[in-house]
């Protein structure tokens, strides 16, 4: 019995070593999908976090990358932000072309990357003491992350994502945000810390 256990242990270790030797991160194209908690890091006068108070929201993201070389990629990203508190709700959608720079090591099984993008940021909130507010803005994104391979062409990312846009306060909200003037310019920024699964070739 002891011999069988040692044999099985040896087989498992051998398979694990073989899998590790064959694992690598995508080099040509990659698709990632992930999620995590999200916080507002700038007050953004008149927006959801300012009106209902600081609250943790949710973040969901998808991204496609085409690697011109293993260290440089062009792609497109989609992010969805949502939150609710005391029957007040937030829903934002962001889509943008992206540029990624990546540094690989450990025989292409580990990497660190940075991604920037500029695109459309669609903001919508619905507050219990006011009407729904919905508007599109020019948005920007900055993301950094560490990724490691778990199989051939499959990896896991630990990432931080920051989204920002210029929040144009206007008279539509004046009825219940009377402590601000019309056309008050303010920025809004969000930070998410999450994980993502990436796969490709």
Question: For each predicted feature, which ranges?
Answer:
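Cleavable N-terminal export/targeting peptides
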Residues: 1-28, 200-201
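Residues on the lipid-exposed face of transmembrane beta-strands in outer-membrane beta-barrel proteins
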Residues: 35-37, 62-66, 76-78, 97-103, ...
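Structural signature of outer-membrane beta-barrel domains
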Residues: 38-42, 81-85, 119-125, 163-169, ...
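Outer-membrane beta-barrel translocator domains and adjoining extracellular loop/strand segments
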Residues: 43-51, 85-92, 124-133, 168-177
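Repeated loop/turn-to-beta-strand initiation elements of outer-membrane beta-barrel proteins
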Residues: 70-74, 109-112, 150-156, 201
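Predominantly the C-terminal beta-signal and adjacent terminal strand-loop region
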Residues: 140-142, 147-201
């Amino acid at each position: 019995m002891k011999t069988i256990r040692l044999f099985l242990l040896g087989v498992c270790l051998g398979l694990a070593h073989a899998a590790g030797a064959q694992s690598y991160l995508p080099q040509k194209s990659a698709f990632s999908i992930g999620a995590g908690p999200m916080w507002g890091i700038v007050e953004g006068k008149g927006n959801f976090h300012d009106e209902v108070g600081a609250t943790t929201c949710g973040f969901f993201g998808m991204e496609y990358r085409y690697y011109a070389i293993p260290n440089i990629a062009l792609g497109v990203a989609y992010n969805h932000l949502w939150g609710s508190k005391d029957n007040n709700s937030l829903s934002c959608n962001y889509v943008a072309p992206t540029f990624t720079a990546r540094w690989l090591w450990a025989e292409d099984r580990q990497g660190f990357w940075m991604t920037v993008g500029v695109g459309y940021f669609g903001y919508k909130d619905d507050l219990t003491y006011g009407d729904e507010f919905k508007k599109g803005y020019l948005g920007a994104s900055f993301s950094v992350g560490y990724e490691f391979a778990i199989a051939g062409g499959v990896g896991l990312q630990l990432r931080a994502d920051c989204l920002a846009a210029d929040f144009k306060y206007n008279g539509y909200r004046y009825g219940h945000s009377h402590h601000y003037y019309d056309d008050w310019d303010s920025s809004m920024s969000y930070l998410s810390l999450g994980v993502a699964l990436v796969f490709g070739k």
